[in-house]
C-alpha cells in the first residue's frame, strides 16, 4: 500500500488491428520475457485459426469466451477468532476481466496441442462454447463460493 496517496491505474492502448484494449491486455498476459512481437503473432494467428474454423468474427468469439470465463463470485480467506473462513465475495468488474484473461492464458499453456496458437485458439473456442478448462475453473470458483455461503456475513 502506497504512503503518498492512491495509485493511478495505467491505461493500456488499444491494439492496432482490432482497436481493442481487451486484445492488448491479452497480448500483455501472453507476453514472456518482454517479447511483445511474439505474443502478438501468437494471438493474431490464433484469431486466424478461429476465423478459419468457425467462420465467425474472432473478436466476437473472444468476447463471448471471456464473458463465459469471468467469475461473478470468489472466496477470500478471513480469520475470525482463530479460525480461517472462506468468505464468498463479489468480484469487481476489473478483476473479473483480469481473472478471465489469466485463466484463459494459463489453461491454454497447459493444453496438449503442438503450437501455442492452436492451444489458445482451441481454449478460446472451447470457452465460447462453455466448455474447456478455464470455464471449469470459473464453475469451481462459483461452487466454492456457493458452498461457503454460510460465511457471507463475515464480509468486510
Swiss-Prot record:
Gene3D superfamilies: Ribosomal protein S7 domain. SUPFAM superfamilies: Ribosomal protein S7. The keyword RNA-binding applies. InterPro entries: Ribosomal_uS7 (IPR000235), Ribosomal_uS7_bac/org-type (IPR005717), Ribosomal_uS7_CS (IPR020606), Ribosomal_uS7_dom (IPR023798), Ribosomal_uS7_dom_sf (IPR036823). GO terms for biological process: translation. Disulfide bonds: none annotated. Keywords: Ribonucleoprotein, Ribosomal protein, RNA-binding, rRNA-binding, tRNA-binding. The keyword tRNA-binding applies. It holds the Pfam family Ribosomal_S7. Coiled coil: none annotated. GO terms for molecular function: rRNA binding; structural constituent of ribosome; tRNA binding. GO terms for cellular component: small ribosomal subunit. It comes from the Bacteria. Part of the 30S ribosomal subunit. Contacts proteins S9 and S11. Belongs to the universal ribosomal protein uS7 family. PANTHER family: RIBOSOMAL PROTEIN S7. One of the primary rRNA binding proteins, it binds directly to 16S rRNA where it nucleates assembly of the head domain of the 30S subunit. Is located at the subunit interface close to the decoding center, probably blocks exit of the E-site tRNA. This is Small ribosomal subunit protein uS7. It comes from Brevibacillus brevis (strain 47 / JCM 6285 / NBRC 100599). The lineage of its organism: Bacteria, Bacillati, Bacillota, Bacilli, Bacillales.
